């Protein structure tokens, strides 16, 4: 039973890495800096409820943030999101 649980955890971790790692790489500039506007939305790890905004590649979209974790593609207002991420 312990081996099956371990293998299941390894498989889950592998899938999460395969999904997350390419998204992080595509958000990286050539000089190694991360463009926060290209990161996926990150709801965070807690169960609190904060309405925030993230840039989805074209526009700013509202999402629920849990209050801890996530990433820097998170803004308190649509205006702040557009100011940082919208291209003129």
From Swiss-Prot:
Annotated positions for site Reactive bond for chymotrypsin: 47-48
Location of the protein in the cell: Secreted
Organ and tissue specificity: Expressed by the venom gland.
Protein name: Kunitz-type U15-theraphotoxin-Hhn1h
Task of the protein: Serine protease inhibitor that inhibits trypsin at a molar ratio of 1:1.
Disulfide bonds: 37-85, 60-81
InterPro entries attached to this UniProt entry: Kunitz_BPTI, Kunitz_BPTI_sf, Serpin_venom_toxin
Lineage: Eukaryota, Metazoa, Ecdysozoa, Arthropoda, Chelicerata
Primary localization: secreted
Origin species: Cyriopagopus hainanus (Chinese bird spider)
């Amino acid at each position: 039973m312990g081996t099956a649980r371990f293998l299941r955890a390894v498989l889950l971790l592998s899938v999460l890495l395969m999904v997350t790692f390419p998204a992080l790489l595509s958000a990286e500039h050539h000089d190694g800096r991360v463009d926060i506007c290209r990161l996926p939305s990150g709801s965070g790890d807690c169960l609190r409820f904060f309405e925030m905004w993230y840039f989805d590649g074209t526009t700013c979209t509202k999402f629920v943030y849990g209050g801890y974790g996530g990433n820097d593609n998170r803004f308190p207002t649509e205006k702040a999101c557009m100011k940082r991420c919208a291209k003129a």
